[in-house]
Amino acid sequence: MVRPAQVRAFSGLARSATSTRLIPSQCQNALRCASLPGSRLSALPLRATQITSSPLRKWHQIRNASAAATATLAEQAAADPEGLSQEEIISNIDAEEWKRISKVRNIGIAAHIDSGKTTATERVLFYTGRINSIHEVRGRDSVGAKMDSMDLEREKGITIQSAATFCDWVKKEDGKEEKYHFNLIDTPGHIDFTIEVERALRVLDGAVMILCAVSGVQSQTITVDRQMKRYNVPRISFVNKMDRMGANPFKAIDQINSKLRLPAAAVQVPIGAEDEFQGVVDLIRMKAIYNEGPRGEVIVEKDEIPEHLKPVAEERRRILIETLADVDDEIAEIFLDEREPTNEQIKDAIRRATIALKFTPVFMGSALADKSIQPMLDGVCDYLPNPSEVTNLALDQKRKEAQVKLLPYGSEPFVGLAFKLEESNFGQLTYIRVYQGTLRKGANVFNARNDKKVKVPRIVRMHSNEMEEVQEIGAGEICAVFGVDCASGDTFTDGQLAYTMSSMFVPEPVISLSIKPKNNKDSANFSKAMARFQREDPTFRVSYDAESEQTIISGMGELHLDIYVERMRREYKVDCETGQPQVAYRETIGRRVEFDHLLKKQSGGPGDYARVVGWMEPSDSLEENKFEEQIVGGAISEKFLFACEKGFNLATEKGPLIGHKVLGTKMVINDGATHMTDSSEMSFKNATQQAFRKAFMESQPHVLEPLMKTVVTAPIEFQGDVIGLLNKRNATINDSEIGVDEFTVYADCSLNGMFGFSSHLRAATQGKGEYTMEFSHYEKAPGQLQKELVQKYLKAQADRHKK
């Protein structure tokens, strides 16, 4: 039965401008919209009885009502974003737009290094028809995986840059076929390239988190989990490598629950394991699923599941329903009533809980063995959101950065985010996620950061290092454009809106080294490469040390910097000399010290005069420095106080102890004096710097060193050797785990003690050990190390003065 509200919704629904009659899909969409809670369409003023027999008048009434509804939504999106639900936004999407956007999935594949991300992506591309044959990582067949387009990636067998592609997947179930469009990004697993994961997750609507069936949740899995939570990205999980010895998917699920603190349950159980892994049992439909064909491209479903698996499948289905009852109200009600939920109710609950970030369904298979990848793709369609189901906020610069909810409508003013830059043979390629409106070839767009207008000459869809030209891209899609000069994280609009979007989190570099070209004639290419790498990678920093007259590069680890040095040699033909890696030490103080500093230079003519009085003390945390003024009675004017703050900020950039940045220091100025003619902004800036340096050295200064969260995995027979290696480096061992044939050690290590660790680990474990390091926190350096660093700094200063 159609309620009156549904009739009104139906009559007010937007139609295609090229049609004057109602099409069946629009009828269905109208009823779909009206059934959503909080639908605004039911409130439209147009009624079914008001439509006359005139097609032209009918079209004008429909168009005006639709435009009015959209305008009302746009006003509410700006005025009250929290009060506007996604259901209301979805209910007002045009029928044709809904047909497109409801089948779009923007997803990323992320995991710990060597969990099989790129191998799984290769199968996804093959099964969706995007590539004609499968190639493996490490270039074992002289081709290499499609998504690893750089020679370095194929040689080393690791992903260095995130790679974007698109493909179409036809989901088949119970005789029905539905075509979905995936925008897919394969990300690196190594912690040194974590910025690639950050910027991918910033623009994606969902993700596939891959885990190893043997190792379960590993160190980088925890990092990826933290990144997904930072950007509120729903995820399904895929336990890979089910064909490996020691595979235990249920241990991995338990670790998701305990280590990641995210409710998880299997939606499949394996048929066999290790070298006898054959397929999976779908716990929702209770069917056995097998892969056949040379590369597992044929899916065979059987109603009869193996007899010995029935008790396991029934038990795991019960656990799935119980877990859902804890995170979904509808299933909880059914569970409490002791009723059995239908398959559709279970699937709907999984979808609701996954999108609400309360749950992750766990699939399982083996990418390398070509088994059970297709059911995971069905899971992407069933449980991950389309772009209209995700809340995306912008900041309105005209209203003091008030939050605004973006509407995924093609008819609205364009808003997009540039999330990745890449140099190609045709110039700079800028990856853009379109959040609102439509981006068209030849259109003018405005960079919100500098209000600069640029024309979009070409729009392409990327497939690794290949591209396909398109004329326009709608809301919710990802594309790349040429000829747009910008920085990573810039917001683009069509000029109608003064919106900006929050950028991605960029971690601070922890390691530096000096670099210079071996041949001076390569200086031009050297500078060009440095500028490009900085523009593409926000975690790669380049600076010039005026005292040592050296170019310094900084990054996330030894591998990170080594890759850029090697890329410079290959891509720019520049051989470089590098110095010893330098640790990014920090300086701080240990106690409060008061100061009263006078800068006075009066020798005829304009002089300098500035007096600053106050104190310095440790701030609440080692995160940032703080400057405060507590002047009463105007002893120092406002413009001079601004100069004092500038002097403080300059002083913290290079501490007086060993010349490194200062952390966790607070400076308060509460009194001072000025001179009628000799005081200036420069005087107060210099006086503040001098007062800072003097007070700093009197306040028990000490050096801080970066501690790295280190995880080492190796075969069990090498456990003693690995522990010995860590003890030699004064590591603090926090935890250890022993598996079937390997063990894992979790430790905090000083970065300074970890240089060269990889070669020692390889030697101690016959090349079978691996480790990852991630910055943890800064901690007070040992007294002997501080003494050595201070002496080294003072000697370097003395040598420069001699010159």
From Swiss-Prot:
The UniProt record gives the binding positions of GTP as: 111-118, 186-190, 240-243
Transit sequence range:
1-24
Pathway the protein contributes to: Protein biosynthesis; polypeptide chain elongation
Q: Which UniProt keywords apply?
A: Elongation factor, GTP-binding, Mitochondrion, Nucleotide-binding, Protein biosynthesis, Transit peptide
Q: Where in the cell is it found?
A: Mitochondrion
**GO terms for biological process?**
mitochondrial translational elongation
Q: Which InterPro entries match?
A: EFG_II, EFG_III, EFG_III/V, EFG_IV, EFG_V-like, EFTu-like_2, G_TR_CS, P-loop_NTPase
Q: Which GO terms describe its cellular component?
A: mitochondrion
- Pfam families under this entry? EFG_C, EFG_III, EFG_IV, GTP_EFTU, GTP_EFTU_D2
- Highest taxon, organism lineage: Eukaryota
Q: What is its main location?
A: mitochondrion
Single GO term (MF): GTP binding
* UniProt domain tr-type G: residue ranges: 102-388
Family note: Belongs to the TRAFAC class translation factor GTPase superfamily. Classic translation factor GTPase family. EF-G/EF-2 subfamily.
NCBIfam families, sorted? EF-G, PRK12740.1-5, small_GTP
Q: What functional role does this protein have?
A: Mitochondrial GTPase that catalyzes the GTP-dependent ribosomal translocation step during translation elongation. During this step, the ribosome changes from the pre-translocational (PRE) to the post-translocational (POST) state as the newly formed A-site-bound peptidyl-tRNA and P-site-bound deacylated tRNA move to the P and E sites, respectively. Catalyzes the coordinated movement of the two tRNA molecules, the mRNA and conformational changes in the ribosome.
What's the protein here called? Elongation factor G, mitochondrial
Tell me which species this is from.
Talaromyces marneffei (strain ATCC 18224 / CBS 334.59 / QM 7333) (Penicillium marneffei)
The coding gene here is mef1
